[in-house]
Amino acid sequence: MKAKQSKEKIIKETLDTALEVGDVYCTRHSNLRDVQLVFHLVVDDTLQSADLSSRHPCLNGIRNIVRLTVRLGITSIHIPLLLVEQASENMTIAWCVRRAEMVYKCVKGYLMEVCGVCGGSAVGGGVTSVPHFNIHLVLPSGLADGVYQQISAMFPTIFHLVPSVSMAVQEP
């Protein structure tokens, strides 16, 4: 009888802890080429068309992913820049540029935050090494003409290119 109650309690707790928008979970992979770990960001359909603020749960999820990569020693990640998998008709050029700008600025802030935590000065006044991160910002295929050019032109104005920051174009 006690075992049955315990099992029912576990099932109830599992049902009560459903994933919400912005939650992140992680899976390990050994059969994917060059991928060992995948962070999954929980989103909903409103992300396809809604404007984002810096307080949106999905951007907080990206922040948690960046923080986890530092904690786990992961130095290379791919982030969908528009936070969508596929282009759709309602994604105007203006919408894409606004979304990209918001994600650019948030990712930059998250990187500055984690680099401030892990790249401070050492005891005795010496400088510790600052970690090197490769962030691949990916755009969905099928975007309107001119979107890629406008979004890539925005990159150096937000990240203020320095020798340690480079922008590479990779065609699918």
Residue spans of the language-model regions?
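Macrodomain-like recognition of ADP-ribose-binding/processing modules
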Residues: 1-172
